[in-house]
């Protein structure tokens, strides 16, 4: 079993974290295992997330700075979907498998519950086993699959849909 990082802590991200968040996100984009995005993001683009009021948490470890982030944003601008957040989680390559993803997603769930979110939803590539295991352990349910939902490098990809209701008790006991 992989050992957890020592001195891992989570906190709400701020604008000063935009560079680190962009670096982590760009690793995920390059690896092609967690997003349909193909173009690297700049810190200025990440800064727009803060200006839009997105909920962003980071995990820091052993004085290395941010090693993971989780972000939630409105699922839709339509009023009927108010309170539903769509989220993403990314972990720096060197820190994958060390529970940073678990820590930062747990912090996001807690913060989203505190902000009054009703539900969190996301999409995961079917072969992303690590994400699927993490999501299951944190109380997310796989509720279906979007078939050929988007193209990545010219190939139509499926996405597993996950969700977690937050209104009945918040974060699970870990």
PLM-predicted stretches and their roles:
Residues 99, 128, 154:
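Conserved G/P- and acidic residue-centered "switch" motifs that form tight phosphate/ATP-binding loops
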Residues 71-74, 79, 121-124, 136, ...:
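Conserved catalytic-core motifs of GNAT/GCN5-like acyltransferases
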């Amino acid at each position: 079993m992989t050992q957890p990082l020592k001195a891992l802590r989570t906190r709400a991200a701020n604008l000063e974290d935009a560079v680190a968040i962009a670096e982590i996100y760009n690793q995920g984009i390059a690896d092609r295992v967690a997003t349909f995005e193909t173009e690297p993001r700049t810190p200025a683009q990440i800064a727009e997330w803060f200006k839009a009021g997105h909920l962003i948490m980071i995990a820091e470890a052993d004085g290395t700075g941010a090693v993971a982030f989780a972000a939630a944003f409105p699922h839709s601008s339509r009023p009927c979907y108010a309170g539903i957040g769509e989220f993403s989680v990314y972990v720096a390559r060197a820190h994958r498998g060390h529970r940073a993803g678990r820590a930062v997603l747990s912090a996001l769930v807690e913060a989203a519950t505190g902000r009054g979110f009703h539900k969190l939803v996301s999409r995961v590539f079917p072969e992303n086993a690590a994400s699927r295991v993490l999501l299951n352990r944190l109380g997310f349910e796989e509720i279906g699959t979007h078939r050929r939902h988007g193209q990545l490098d010219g190939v139509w990809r499926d996405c597993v849909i996950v969700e977690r209701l937050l209104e009945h008790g918040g974060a699970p006991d870990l």
